[in-house]
């Protein structure tokens, strides 16, 4: 089954009106691969501003959302709010949410379940730390994280999984294409064994972790890498080259 390449740009806590306008101008004027789906993860306060400036064919993602529709949850936003201002995606389970804000596998899975029920598409993040990789626990960790999602997600058609080795995020260290492919192949097999062969064949698995224009083409050649979740490079003009990595 052919899976449409999908590239997400996660701006994290970066950007202001001026820089967002510049990024939008770059993306609007660039010849982007029509066979690649592009999603921009923008800080919540700028989502509406970005939606008005970005090309309409680009998806827009919140970087977080809570597990209920409304209520006394100071500082949180809901999937319904994201949809209301024009976002169609949300990034959940990012390693920074797990490590800095203490989000558990169970909470992240509940967030994903609610976001999907509210009609958002979800980029569901997983990945191991350097300590876990060096201990040979990569497969064990990503399987545990996938199990948590699988307990709550029954329909996977609006889910993209993003594998992000935590040790490669923002460090300049990147998993080699072979290292990345090895984990993606394991995830594909895990999906086949634990969900279904159909989901395994159709679900897109992105790679995230210091993706740049320099390494994107080699990573994109791997059979089980279906796109990227890009951090810092998505704020730069080279993001266009990453989007076009399959060309």
Curated annotation (Swiss-Prot):
**Which family does the record claim for this protein?**
Belongs to the triosephosphate isomerase family.
Q: What are this entry's molecular-function GO terms?
A: protein homodimerization activity; triose-phosphate isomerase activity
What is the active site of this protein?
94 (electrophile), 164 (proton acceptor)
Q: Which HAMAP family does the record match to this protein?
A: TIM_B
**Keywords of the record:** Gluconeogenesis, Glycolysis, Isomerase
Please list the reactions this protein catalyses.
D-glyceraldehyde 3-phosphate = dihydroxyacetone phosphate
Q: What is its EC number?
A: 5.3.1.1
Membrane-spanning ranges = none
| Pathway noted in the entry | Carbohydrate biosynthesis; gluconeogenesis; Carbohydrate degradation; glycolysis; D-glyceraldehyde 3-phosphate from glycerone phosphate: step 1/1
Q: Where does substrate bind?
A: 10, 12
Q: Can you name this protein?
A: Triosephosphate isomerase
Q: Name one GO biological process term.
A: gluconeogenesis
Q: Which GO terms describe its cellular component?
A: cytosol; M band; Z disc
Superkingdom, according to UniProt? Eukaryota
List where this protein forms a coiled coil: none
Subunit info? Homodimer.
The first-level EC class reads isomerase
Spell out the CDD domains in the cross-references: TIM
């Amino acid at each position: 089954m052919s899976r449409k390449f999908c590239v997400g740009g996660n701006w994290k806590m970066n950007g202001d009106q001026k820089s967002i306008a510049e990024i939008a101008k770059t993306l609007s004027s660039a010849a982007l691969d029509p066979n690649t789906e592009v999603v921009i993860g923008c800080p919540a306060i700028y989502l509406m501003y970005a939606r008005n400036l970005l090309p309409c064919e680009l998806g827009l993602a919140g970087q977080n959302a809570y597990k209920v529709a409304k209520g006394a949850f100071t500082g949180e936003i809901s999937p319904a709010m994201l949809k209301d201002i024009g976002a169609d995606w949300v990034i959940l389970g990012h390693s920074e949410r797990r490590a800095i804000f203490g989000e558990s596998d169970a909470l992240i899975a509940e967030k994903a379940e609610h976001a999907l029920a509210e009609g958002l598409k979800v980029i569901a993040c997983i990945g191991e730390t350097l300590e876990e990789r060096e201990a040979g626990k990569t497969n064990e960790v990503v399987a545990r994280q996938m199990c948590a999602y699988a307990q709550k997600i029954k329909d996977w058609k609006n889910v993209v999984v993003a594998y992000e080795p935590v040790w490669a995020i923002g460090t300049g260290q990147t998993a080699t294409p072979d290292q990345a492919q090895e984990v993606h192949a394991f995830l594909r097999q895990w999906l086949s064994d634990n969900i279904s062969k159909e989901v395994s064949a159709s679900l897109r698995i992105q790679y995230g972790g210091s993706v740049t224009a320099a390494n994107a083409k080699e990573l994109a050649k791997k059979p089980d890498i279906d796109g990227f979740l890009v951090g810092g490079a998505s704020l730069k003009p080279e993001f266009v080259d990453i989007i076009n990595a399959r060309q």
